[in-house]
Amino acid sequence: MHKVFIAGSIKIKHLDAKVKARIDNIIAKECDVLVGDADGADTSIQQYLWEHAVTHAVVYCSGPMPRNNVGSWPVRSVDTSYAPGSRAFYTAKDLQMAKDADFGLMIWDSQSTGTLSNVIELLLLQRKSVVYVNKLKAFKNVRDAKELEELVALMSDTAVKKADAKIRLFEKIDRLKQLQGDLFHA
């Protein structure tokens, strides 16, 4: 059974009908859903899964207890030595979800470095993502560095600079290009 890592920007509190339809497809295929415990998109995803009586979901959290678990699903607690509440602390669960997933469905506001980081981690593990870009009301497939660059092009200059400062965005894109052999095709 496929495992789908579904996540999104913390600022996104409501799921678009197109995202719900995509989640409906995941539910119909009885894929295992891996979801985080954050407020925002994670909680909205959990709520939608609960409303559809999904039983094949796992809530991932950093540390011993999830912040949110709407459906009382099994919990995958990820141990981390980072300070509770820090960015690195919460990133630990995202990294584990990327490792455990076969592919990702991301809901993105064209700013969130956490969601963008999830897409990158999946790519580094040779897994693709389907990213719903909220401002476009459209899905973008991200299967390689080129498609990641197309996604990044949707960000404002300020958001790109912030992402580079927070997650070393350009360094990660270059790493992906090297891993995928894109540098030899430039």
Which ranges hold each PLM region?
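Acidic/glycine-enriched connector segments
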Residues: 12-153, 157
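Active-site donor-nucleotide binding/catalytic segment of nucleotide-sugar enzymes
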Residues: 6-11
